[in-house]
């Protein structure tokens, strides 16, 4: 809810709180938070960091029944690198590799299956956009990606 209403920056402190209890009661994993002060089963904490990272930071909004994935990233400005690897969406696996160097942001978006429609929302403050090495108008709003692997460069 914090990500949805106030953004990821506001939610970061809660994610850190969850991760700070790593191996506290359950070796090799985070301590499950519940009203009775803990459970061995992981059920709730995963939603405390997976949903914010996948849905809000990487901006993945899948519609597997249509073989469609909308991507609207909101990666924090202080992150120089982030990677989402092999996210299962229907019979497909989506990977997003993000790198930032100065003002340039680069995304490599890949899938394991052909025939899926990926829609990438361009941030409003872009001056230059290249898709697979070809420049496109910076006022595109959203672009449709085809194929197994696509590279997006934003300035």
Describe every region a protein language model picked out:
Residues 1-155:
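Non-catalytic C-terminal accessory modules of carbohydrate-active enzymes
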């Amino acid at each position: 809810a914090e990500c949805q209403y106030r953004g990821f920056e506001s939610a970061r402190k809660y994610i850190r709180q969850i991760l700070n209890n790593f191996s506290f009661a359950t070796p090799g994993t985070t301590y499950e938070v519940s009203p009775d002060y803990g459970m061995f089963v992981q059920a709730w904490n995963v939603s405390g960091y997976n949903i914010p990272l996948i849905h809000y930071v990487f901006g993945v909004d899948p519609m597997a029944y249509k073989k469609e994935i909308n991507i609207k990233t909101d990666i924090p400005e202080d992150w120089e690198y982030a990677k989402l690897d092999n996210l299962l969406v229907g019979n497909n696996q989506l990977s997003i590799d993000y790198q930032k160097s100065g003002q340039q942001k680069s995304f490599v978006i890949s899938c394991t299956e052909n025939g899926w429609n990926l829609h990438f929302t361009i941030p409003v403050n872009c001056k230059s956009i290249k898709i697979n090495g070809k420049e496109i108008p910076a006022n595109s709003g959203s672009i449709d990606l085809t194929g197994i692997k696509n590279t997006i460069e934003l300035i």
